[in-house]
Amino acid sequence: MSQNNDSLTRFMLDGANVRGALVKLTRTWQTISSRIEYPSAVADYLGQSVAASALFISSIKIDGRLSIQMRGTGAIKTLFAECTTDGTLRGLSIFEPPIPAHIPLSDFGADSIMAITIERNTAPELEPQRYQGLVGFQAQDLASAFEQYFEQSEQLPTRIVLFSNAEQAVGLLIQQMPEQDRPADDWSRIQMLFDTVRAEELFSLDANELLYRLFHEESVRVLDSLALSFACSCSRERVETALISLGLDEMQQTLLENENITVHCDFCGQAYQFSQEQGLSLFWPKSSVPVSPSMH
């Protein structure tokens, strides 16, 4: 039986005016998590974040990408997950050992910041259009924090469940759509059904089978399914922009100490190498690059 691995399934509960999304990641998650040897607690947060980014892209009506980014002062310094409307994902975490077996959300640090950013694709010569909202750390876990975000920022009652292990990252989301004259107990009834889902079901069941098992009495209707895969948006042009931002003085100093500069992408491992001439040509036209005698 196909288990809809590496897919995002959107659905409607027509009987209650509730929309939802189900994400299952296997190969994609294994590719992301294999780049760095993550402690289990860090991998768990990263897997949940990657799954959440796919869930959230399900309701985006623009051509672009959605990212979840956290900067903390605790053991986990950075958490980043991104999904595009084309179905490509990437993710990364930076942490500081030793890492405990369990990290409560409250231990991310008092000055921690987590943001959800939506970026609309634009022409290369135009500045990207971004929309950003902040996620609080007052919840018990990541899924609850995202639920509070949608409740407060989007005014959409939302339920989310997220799980990850070494093999898979999965998630389920339901949202009550705005509509007047709906029975007040519709949403309560759907939540009761939602609360029965177990991690083992999300890991093992086919998407259609899981949705039928949970919501067959609520006229569940699958809208579509999007294939998901790992892909990185790094490029030589982006690396050049980052090097230029360092400034000419730092570039010259680096090139005095090294024959060339090699930049590795932490997401995919791609290496970008720049010779002395290539590094300096980022600041001057190639024909006028001044070469120091010490750089011969």
Q: Which residues are covered by each model-predicted region?
A:
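Interaction interfaces in information-processing and related assembly proteins
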Residues: 2-224, 292-296
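Cys/His-clustered metal-coordination modules, chiefly Zn-binding fingers
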Residues: 195-296
